Amino acid sequence: MTVHPTWVFDSSPIPDPHGRGERAVKFFRALKHPKSTAPKNAFELAPFWERILRRIYGPSDASGNRQVRTVYIQIPRGARKTTFGAGLGLLHSCGHEKVPGGACILAASAEDQAELAFDEAKAFIKATPALARATHIVDSELKLEHLASGSNLRAIPAEGDVQQGKTPYFVLIDELHVWKSRKLWRALKSGLLKVPNTLLVIITTAGRGQDNLGYEEYSYARKVATGEIVNPSYLPIIFEPPAKFD
C-alpha cells in the first residue's frame, strides 16, 4: 500500500500563512472521545491525519481564503475515517471554521451510515465539556446546532430529501462509490456553488466497477494526483497498491 502524493508521510513544510492549519489541529487535539484510551479520553490524532488537516486548511491567499475547496481521500478500512469526518463536521459547525447560520452536512450512503456518522459527532460533543455546553442536539433529526452562531450539522442519507442540501457551507461525503442515486450528489454540489468559501470532503474506501459516482470522482482525483490535471483547489489523497501509479 502506498499513498499519493507523498507529503502525507514525509516532513516537508506545509504553508500556513494565516495559522488556519494550526488552529484546525488544535481543535482536533482538544476533542475528547469516550472510546479513547489516552489520558482523560483525549482524541488521538494520527500523524497522517494531522498532515492532511494542515494541508487542507493551511495554504491560503493573501486575504486568508483557503486554497482547497474539494478534498478526495481514498483510504483503507480501519483508518477511523468516520471519526475523522465527524471531527471535520464539528470544526465547521462549532470550531474555528464555523460561520453564522452555516449549514454543515455529513452525507452517507444509507440511513444507518448517516446515524453512525452522527453518533461519532455526538460522542465527541458529550465527551468534550466545552462543546456540550455550546451545542443543542436533536437526535430525531440527526442534527446539532451551535447555539451562539446558529451554525448546524446534520447527517443525511444519500436517498434523503435533496432539499436538505440546498445551500451547505461544508459537506462531507462518505463512501461515494456505493451511492445509488445521483440526486443528492448533484444538489449538494450545486448548493456549494451558492455559498462562498465552501468545502467538500469525500472520504471513501476503494470501490469496485467503473459505472458509479465513486469511480468517476476517483478518476478525476487520480489525474490531479499524477499532474495530468492541474487544479490547486482540488486535493487528492489516494491510498492504493503502488502498481496503480506506475
Predicted region positions:
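Phosphate/NTP-binding elements of NTP-utilizing enzymes
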Residues: 1-246
